[in-house]
A protein has these predicted regions:
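Short, basic, helix/turn surface patches
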Residues: 58-72, 112-117, 213-223, 242
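A generic local secondary-structure boundary/capping motif
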Residues: 23-24, 107-110, 153-155, 175-178, ...
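Short, ordered loop/turn segments at secondary-structure junctions
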Residues: 37-40, 50, 87-88, 123-125, ...
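Predominant activation on well-ordered alpha-helical scaffold segments within soluble catalytic domains
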Residues: 21-22, 69-72, 116, 143-149, ...
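Ferredoxin-type iron-sulfur electron-transfer modules and their immediate structural context
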Residues: 2, 51-55, 125-128, 223
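Beta1-alpha1 glycine-rich phosphate/pyrophosphate-binding loop at the start
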Residues: 6-70, 74, 160-202, 213
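A Rossmann-like FAD-binding core segment of flavoenzymes
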Residues: 75-103, 180-242
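FAD-binding core/adjacent interface of flavoenzyme oxidoreductases
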Residues: 1-11, 69-162, 238-241
């Protein structure tokens, strides 16, 4: 087991983790370490190839990968160390109040890191179909927007050609446009609430400009198909989603 001591360990090398590391270094902390489970830094930004990032921070419009690259460059200029392909398996509290982080990767094997502070910057997870309580069987062809975005933008694979999107947050709107640009037919975007959860400009640029209908107070009541999705039944709901 390899052992090391740090002042701050940041779990997650996406935009939040990189920003936290840079802020810690600017505040005078020298022993900062980023642990990232993926093979590269940048997190979710690497699959967000649309523009719209960086206006507040860099005063110019960037794509997700460009925005991530700016932060990665700043972290490397600040000589902030990071470990890739590294999975954290445990965090525990030591008797003196410090924390012990256990992590593992192929190069170092098992790592034991003692640190004053642990910053959790692992991002978030999308709600699954199960969490949304949509009735029906479990055929192929059901994806979260982030997974579909990963397949299209990173893997170069289309998850389908006839699409219904449930949820009108920004990623749902952006993926509606992306699927059309890749040749799919987006039947509609359904939104449970009485208003869209996305920015107005995304509604205009991603839906209106591509003639994609937005159905408010609408959700998926049933999924049809056994081996693969064959269709869905949409239903209207009230403002409380019932």
């Amino acid at each position: 087991m390899s052992k090391r001591t740090e002042d701050i360990v940041i779990i997650g090398g996406g935009p939040a983790g990189l920003a936290a590391a840079l802020s810690a270094r600017k505040a005078g902390c020298e022993k900062v370490l980023i642990l990232e489970r993926d093979r590269e830094l940048g997190g979710i930004l690497n699959q967000c190839i649309h523009n719209g990032f960086g206006l507040h921070t860099f005063k110019e419009e960037l794509t997700g990968p460009e925005y991530a690259e700016r932060y990665i460059d700043m972290a490397e200029e600040a000589k902030i160390p990071y470990l890739l392909n590294t999975m954290v398996t445990n965090i525990s509290l030591l008797p003196d109040g410090r924390k012990k982080v256990i992590a593992i990767n192929k190069e170092d094997g098992l790592l034991e890191i003692e640190t004053e502070t642990v910053i959790l910057a692992m991002g978030c997870r999308e709600r699954s179909r199960g969490a949304l309580n949509i009735p029906g069987s479990r055929p192929a062809g059901i994806y979260s927007a982030g997974t579909a975005q990963y397949y299209v933008n990173i893997r170069g694979r289309m998850p389908g050609k006839n699409v219904v999107i449930l949820g009108s947050g920004d990623i749902g709107l952006i993926m509606a446009r992306r699927m059309v640009l890749e040749g799919a037919k987006v039947q509609c975007v359904a939104e449970l609430r009485p208003q869209s959860g996305g920015l107005k400009r995304n509604i205009v640029q991603c839906l209106d400009d591509f003639n994609i209908p937005l159905y408010l107070n609408t959700t998926v009541a049933q999924i049809h198909g056994r081996d693969r999705v064959e269709g869905v039944t949409l239903t209207k709901v009230d403002d409380n989603g019932e």
